[in-house]
């Protein structure tokens, strides 16, 4: 079927709002772009520009993926299947989550749907905590406001790896009739979740706490209009934290930034300006789904932005210093192949085993699952150069909540010694830089 035939097909079955959007299109190239292919379901799930069409994120493409995923889960033959669903602050995220919940419920699955926006690591944790068979997170990470996405997690709270994603894709591709999608607005199989699960997540994060001595460390935090505001402030409640008010509340248009990506200096401009006014020591910024965190550190009258490699290496040293007595021959650090060797060499100096994975945090999560199954190794910390870190096994995805807590505790620990994180990084370079050939490889921009 060519794009024109697909366009006419959609005009026949679409709801009034979708049909009106399609009928308003006058640019043939735009029509072609919306229908020349189906939105691809890859190892990261769905991700695309929102709008009407088979190559866009909308209730129909979400519905197709959900029906296919439901059929895939039912093919296992397991009874009483359960799915956890959460969503971020993006436009249409809550609607897409409700669409998915209704379809899963109509297919006979029990759905545990968050009653509020929450971070990605909360969904990963909840999938495990409620013993679900799968999880779905509606998010497009730090992409521009026009985008949204649909991430799929397995029963362990890990994003689907290659084999499972391929198996699910077969069932999704088999859905070729949008009229067959069992949309449903309400169903007895949909169970709201919220306070209890979020409290359990916070408790799990706080079990990773490493330094709680009083400190006069001053922090400026921005959730960049995303999901981090509540959970990050909860784990930092005993520290001196001020929030960038204009970026505090959820806003799917990300009105104050060009891009809500904490890798980019522009995203932290307002936070750094506030930090200068308040003479804060540390700036934290989490992306909209709060799985990545960027930092800027006061250095004299200016603020220095750290890369993911730098922050990760400092976290490795801090965590291992604080947990040195708990380390054993099984203790393992996991990093991706594009992440610098600085943290790995710090890990080796503490006697840790080092494992490398392909790019994408799901591979780090998969390693944690393997360690639990075999008992051969014990996960201590995992990270990637694109600002994603995990300490603890409460989740199987990168977690900016636990990372923010530990970064602030690390900064407080150093400040109580009369040092900044810049001082700490310089000391790390002096001690470990001679052990590696390349300290800061060029960062490969991408989505994980």
Question: Where in the sequence are the language-model features?
Answer:
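An N-terminal, well-structured beta->alpha segment
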Residues: 5-100, 194-216
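Gly/Ser/Thr-enriched, mixed-charge loops and adjacent short helices
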Residues: 14, 30-35, 39, 148-269, ...
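Conserved phosphate/anionic-ligand binding catalytic regions in large, soluble enzymes, centered on
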Residues: 37-55, 223-231, 383-387, 393-402
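N-terminal small/polar loop signature for handling phosphorylated ligands or for N-terminal nucleophile
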Residues: 84-147, 242-292
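Proline/glycine-rich low-complexity loops and linkers
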Residues: 115, 174-196, 299-383, 390
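Phosphate/diphosphate-binding loops
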Residues: 129-157, 165-173, 261-285, 316-319, ...
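Mobile "lid/hinge" segments at catalytic clefts and subdomain interfaces of large enzymes
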Residues: 168, 387, 396-404, 408-429
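Single conserved hydrophobic/aromatic residue that forms the stacking wall/gate
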Residues: 436-447
């Amino acid at each position: 079927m060519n794009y024109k035939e697909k366009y006419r097909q959609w005009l026949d079955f679409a709801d009034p709002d979708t049909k009106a959007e399609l009928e308003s299109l006058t640019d043939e190239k735009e029509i072609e772009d919306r229908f020349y292919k189906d939105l691809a379901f890859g190892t990261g799930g769905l991700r695309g520009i929102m709008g009407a069409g088979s190559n866009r994120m909308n209730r129909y493409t979400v519905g197709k993926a959900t029906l296919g995923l439901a059929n895939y889960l039912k093919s296992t033959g397991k009874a009483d299947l359960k799915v956890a669903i959460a969503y971020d602050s993006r436009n249409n995220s809550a609607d897409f989550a409700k669409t998915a919940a209704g379809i899963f419920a109509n297919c006979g699955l029990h759905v545990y749907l968050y009653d509020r926006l929450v971070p990605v690591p909360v969904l990963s944790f909840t999938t495990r905590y409620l013993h679900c068979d799968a999880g779905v997170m509606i998010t497009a990470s730090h992409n521009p406001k026009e985008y949204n996405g649909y991430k799929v997690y397995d029963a362990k709270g890990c994003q689907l790896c290659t084999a499972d994603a391929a198996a699910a894709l077969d069932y999704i591709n088999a859905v070729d009739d949008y009229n067959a999608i069992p949309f449903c607005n309400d169903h007895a199989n949909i169970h709201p979740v919220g306070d209890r699960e979020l409290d359990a997540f916070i408790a799990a994060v706080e079990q990773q706490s490493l330094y709680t001595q009083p400190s006069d460390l001053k922090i400026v935090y921005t959730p960049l209009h995303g999901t981090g505001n509540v959970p990050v402030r909860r784990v930092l409640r005993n520290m001196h934290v001020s929030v960038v008010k204009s970026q505090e509340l959820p806003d799917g248009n990300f009105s104050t930034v060009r891009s809500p990506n904490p890798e980019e200096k522009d995203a932290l401009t307002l936070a750094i300006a506030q930090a200068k006014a308040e003479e804060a020591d540390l700036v934290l910024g989490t992306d909209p789904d709060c799985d990545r965190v960027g930092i800027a550190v006061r250095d004299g009258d200016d603020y220095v932005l750290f890369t993911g490699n730098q922050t990760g290496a400092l976290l490795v040293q801090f965590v291992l210093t604080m947990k040195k007595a708990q380390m054993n021959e099984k203790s393992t650090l996991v990093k991706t192949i594009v992440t610098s060797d600085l943290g790995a060499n710090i890990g080796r100096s503490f006697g840790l085993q080092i494992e490398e994975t392909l790019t994408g945090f799901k591979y780090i999560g998969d390693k944690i699952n393997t360690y639990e199954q075999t008992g051969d190794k014990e996960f201590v910390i995992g990270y990637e150069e694109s600002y994603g870190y995990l300490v603890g096994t409460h989740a199987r995805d990168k977690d900016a909540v636990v990372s923010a807590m530990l970064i602030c505790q690390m900064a407080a620990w150093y400040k109580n010694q009369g040092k900044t994180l810049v001082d700490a990084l310089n000391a790390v370079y002096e001690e470990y830089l001679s052990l590696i050939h390349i300290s800061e490889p060029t960062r490969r921009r991408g989505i994980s």
